[in-house]
Amino acid sequence: MPPAVPAAAATARQSASGRERNFKDKDKPESVRNSNIVAAKAVADAVRTSLGPRGMDKMIQSGNGDVTITNDGATILNQMSVIHPTAKMLVELSKAQDIEAGDGTTTVVVMAGALLDAAQNLLSKGIHPTTISESFQSAAAEAEKILDEMSSPVDLSNDALLNKMATTSLNSKVVSQHSWLLAPMAVNAVKKIINSENDSNVNLKMIKIIKKMGDTVEESELIEGALIDQKTMGRGAPTRIEKAKIGLIQFQISPPKTDMENQVIITDYAQMDRALKEERQYLLEICKQIKAAGCNVLLIQKSILRDAVNELALHFLAKMKIMCIKDIEREDIEFYSRILGCRPVASVDHFNADALGYADLVEEIPTGGDGKVIKVTGVQNPGHAVSILLRGSNKLVLEEADRSIHDALCVIRCLVKKKALLPGGGAPEMEIAVKLRNLAQTQHGATQYCWRAFADALELIPYTLAENAGLSPIHTVTELRNNHANGNSSYGVNVRKGYVTDMVEEDVVQPLLVTASAIKQASECVRSILKIDDIVMAVR
């Protein structure tokens, strides 16, 4: 009998440790979920102060000392050092919004953070993550219907309205004081590359933005032609050509190289002279063939294997009064081919007059300091493409102006993709919140709680707009909620006047696609995070 006592004790200890292990295993998903939510909320809180026209800017310093000043959500998150895998999901969320809509990158992250906070409160009440996830999905679908109902159709021929939309996007940027110039520039650029009646998308690659330091942003201009960020090559070569005939080649005007590593051994001066003469004759024949086609402006694609054009060839081209521009990037070939109306040629044997584009004037213009660009104007039969010369007094301003005009272009693209607009100033989010609370009464069980939490979370957008503008957020949101409850669906936070007004009358409007995409993307991201119950390290 005595030996049985230790055995029983051992069995009891094993069963106790087993229960403890089971308890820990049951507790682990909750701790992982909380860890994920805390990490994601930290990212959302980092950019929340940048939301809206009165949002603050962030100074980002890279490892090599480069400094960026911006309040663009996608730029901040893209350059932020993020380690936690769930926090990286919010960075990817911002990128997805940037690709889909081009604007609302800060809004979508703040919205996701608010939904995660709401989900955390629901989890603490014992509601299952799957129930929360499915309820958020149905609430987001209902929110999209509400947005469609409150949206207004847009006529793309109404330039004044399009300018207002672009201005609204630019008002939250560092260069907002130049919105009077950049907004019409963005609208005109998009309208020149689309057919407003038939097109349902905009290829922004057909808008070439050349950034040049010097002067101020006010000196920026939209050019109905091409800008080439290169100088003319060759001493004595022309820098101005009228009635230009433009060729675009993808072959090199330099001595050919053998396909294999062969060696040619030259033993005397006669052989050396013969080799140089052959090289000279080879280059001269190519230049003569280019001249015979009638070409007087030559664009040469950049080559990584050998020189695109060597000094001897440049000398021949200069003698023939042909303007030579080399190092055209491969990804720019399609743009220049379309805008100049010329055909890229891969072999000198196929270079003829049919491949040329025609323009009234090609000239090299100074841009301050040693900077120069090639400007092509008066293009005959131009394709749907335009160029923008963007100026700035320093690198920080220039980069921010580039990001700002990109957002403005994306706003107009959103209108082309989905021809509808919404009032700004947090009006759509508040309208959804008010209507979802009413619709929550028709839901049953835990879904009702989840819909209410979803509605409350969306109110963080107008709350943050008011907070960042120095207003009383509680008073402002309460007043806004009352207005929407009384049917004033276009009322939002007017940060300039400091109180709630009709955003449509104030010309503060935004594309439907931006808000609809933000709600859809944010809810999908939150659902993904809620469904994670463990983090497993992969084998390298």
Swiss-Prot record:
Cite the InterPro entries for this sequence. Answer: Chap_CCT_delta (IPR012717), Chaperone_TCP-1 (IPR017998), Chaperonin_TCP-1_CS (IPR002194), Cpn60/GroEL/TCP-1 (IPR002423), GroEL-like_apical_dom_sf (IPR027409), GROEL-like_equatorial_sf (IPR027413), TCP-1-like_intermed_sf (IPR027410), TCP-1_chaperonin (IPR053374)
Listed CDD domains = TCP1_delta
Give the chief site where it resides: cytoplasm
Q: Which GO terms describe its cellular component?
A: chaperonin-containing T-complex
Where in the cell?
Answer: Cytoplasm
Start-end of Basic and acidic residues biased regions: 18-31
- UniProt GO molecular function: ATP binding; ATP hydrolysis activity; ATP-dependent protein folding chaperone; unfolded protein binding
Annotated GO biological process: post-embryonic body morphogenesis; protein folding
What keywords appear on the UniProt entry? ATP-binding, Chaperone, Cytoplasm, Nucleotide-binding
Query: Which residues lie within the region annotated Disordered?
Result: 1-32
The keyword rRNA-binding is annotated on this UniProt entry? no
Task: Give the record's family classification.
Answer: Belongs to the TCP-1 chaperonin family.
| Protein's name according to its UniProt entry | T-complex protein 1 subunit delta
**Which organism is the protein's source?**
Caenorhabditis elegans
* Record gene name: cct-4
